[in-house]
């Protein structure tokens, strides 16, 4: 009899445990609670790879008839629509879907388009990548590089050739042109470097101004509208190759370590079958002459991990006190 009572108690305990587990899992599912780290509450990161997971609810997966693709808004969108034309056609053939290149004028517009579901595949610039990942559900998987794995660009602080400025220390008391607050080389990296290496802080030691894009800053210094600017040298080199500016008329007073370039990726809820084909399009694309001429520092797309390749950029954000509030 005593043994029967013990068995009954044991069964009762098992039933209670099962009920508790079922109830708690139901609550988690219904409230959308999950591990997400620094990601916005709209996303989950159960595998802790620092990017948004594919939704467990398949009804939230997106399988568009037309894939919308955009490139980071660093220069004239019309120029880049032509440069990316061959790739767009290759992606269309690989995925079996219509692909449209969607030009954007600024980082904010690109981020909002991804967050709202209007973008499926995109290239976000170095500084915007962590913001796009945390606030817009962007999942980067590729970057331009050489066959041997080399990649990247540097931040440069430039002046006109005949400027009296020869060192960042001489920025004090002057106006420095940044590009936009989300840009790595156009704002975040130089801010951290100027503060850490030269004890120069915007508003306290110099006046900051924002041009909007790297080409605006470069042309601003070139034409004398800005005295000093921090820019991505990859953009500078492309403008020189296209004959937009003459290299001899500008001078570099500071050059940073190498940073990762634009990260290419997809919306977190894009159907996995489509994602696989999109990745295939990137990794199998044979670069045409226009592409090689424009992106001369690289010759292929390589696989990347946001957690690894963007570690230095997240550290720069931390040094600048940047938090991904996703407002």
Name these PLM-found stretches:
Residues 69-92, 127, 150-219, 226-228, ...:
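Bilobed "Venus flytrap"/periplasmic-binding protein-like clamshell domains
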Residues 111-170:
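Acidic, polar ligand-binding/catalytic clefts
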Residues 101-112, 202-219, 258-260:
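Short helix-initiation/N-cap motifs at beta->coil->alpha
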Residues 132-144, 239-253:
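Ligand-binding "clamshell"
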Residues 72-73, 147-156, 183-185, 244-316:
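Periplasmic-binding protein-like
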Residues 2-3, 7-8, 25-109, 292-327:
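N-terminal hydrophobic or amphipathic helices and topogenic motifs
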Residues 14-23:
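Bacterial N-terminal signal peptides
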